C-alpha cells in the first residue's frame, strides 16, 4: 500500500522499473498525476485506487503490466488513464476493472478479462490505438461512451465484448465480438 497526493506530477524515468505490489491499495489523492515512462508492474491482492475529490491522471508512455485481478478504480472525483505506450493484462483469471482509459498505444489482454469502465458510467473515451485479445481472454467495454476511431484496431482470437457501453466503432472488423447490452454504432472503416 501507500499513496501519492497533491497537485503535482510524479514521473518515472524511461529506465526505471516500478513494482506496485502488496496487500494494501495504492492510493492517488487530490489532483495528482502519475506519469510512467519506464516499466510499471501492478501485482498483489489490491490495485490502484483514486480517492477523494479532484481529477487524477495516469499517463503511461512506457509499459504497464497488470499481473493481478485487482482493479484500477476511483471513489469521488475522476480518474483518467492515457495510454500511449503498452498496457498488458498478463496474469489473473478473473476480471480487472480499468476506469477511464483513452488508448492511443497498445492494450493487450492475454489472461482473464480486462473490463473498461468510466467514472460513474458517464465518461467519454476515444481510442486510436491497438487492442489485442489473446485466446481465452476477454476485453469488455462495460460502461460509458467509447469511440474506436479509424486508426484503432481490434485483433486476436479472444473475445471482445460490449456489455453496457455506448460504442461508436469506426474501425475494421472486430473478431470474436459479443454484444450483450449497451448501444453500438458500427461504421467499419
Where are these regions (language model features)?
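Extracellular beta-strand-rich, repetitive "passenger/adhesive" scaffolds
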Residues: 1-189
